[in-house]
């Protein structure tokens, strides 16, 4: 009986340790939530929910470059969360003064070769953005991305409001795609662009 209890305690500790590797950051109003999954058994990934509703299912992170693989076997070595609160001005948009608030999560990863990469997320009340930051390594002045591993896995019921990308040099005085095409509201994610060139965000 003691052996069984000891085994359960060890298993519980291991499970807690694995779960503790997942990193959570929320927007300032705590409705928008990002989770970064960093279990060593798989590639790093992330998901997004809003008010408990899934906006983005577990999606892969990472990339391959000419100096190393930053997608598989990545280990989280640390992370920081920094609140962002700033005001900036634009004289050519509808709102000239913008008050921007967000929480920034910086995840520090290391691949099996000890090469480092940061994934920097920003979560505001309505938006999520992220970027990769590669510190200079082995004296390299530039890096070539050879394969993109980043994914965006939307729930099956997701619909779109997108503008199909037009053929080039057609229409009035051959100026397209200078004008927006007709939008289709709540179109299924599986619908292909009518021109075969993908879509443009409005």
Segments from the language model and where they lie:
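N-terminal accessory beta-strand-rich subdomains and adjacent acidic, glycine-rich linkers
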Residues: 22-202
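Bacterial Sec-dependent N-terminal signal peptides
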Residues: 1-22
């Amino acid at each position: 009986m003691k052996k069984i209890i000891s085994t359960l305690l060890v298993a519980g500790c291991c499970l807690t340790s694995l779960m503790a590797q997942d990193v959570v950051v929320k927007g300032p109003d705590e409705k928008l939530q990002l989770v970064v999954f960093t279990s060593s058994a798989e590639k790093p990934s992330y998901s997004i929910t809003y008010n408990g509703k899934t906006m983005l299912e577990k999606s892969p992170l990472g990339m391959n470059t000419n100096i190393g693989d930053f997608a598989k076997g990545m280990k989280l070595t640390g992370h920081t969360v920094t609140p962002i609160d700033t005001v900036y001005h634009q004289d050519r948009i509808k709102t000239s003064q913008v008050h921007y608030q967000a929480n920034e999560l910086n995840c520090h990863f290391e691949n099996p070769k000890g090469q480092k990469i940061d994934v920097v997320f920003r979560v505001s009340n309505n938006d999520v953005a992220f970027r990769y930051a590669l510190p200079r390594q082995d004296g390299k002045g530039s890096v070539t991305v050879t394969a993109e591993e980043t994914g965006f896995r939307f729930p099956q019921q997701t619909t779109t409001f997108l503008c199909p990308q037009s053929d080039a040099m057609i229409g009035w005085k051959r100026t397209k795609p200078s004008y927006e095409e007709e939008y289709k509201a709540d179109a299924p994610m599986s619908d292909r662009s009518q021109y075969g060139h993908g879509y443009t965000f409005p």
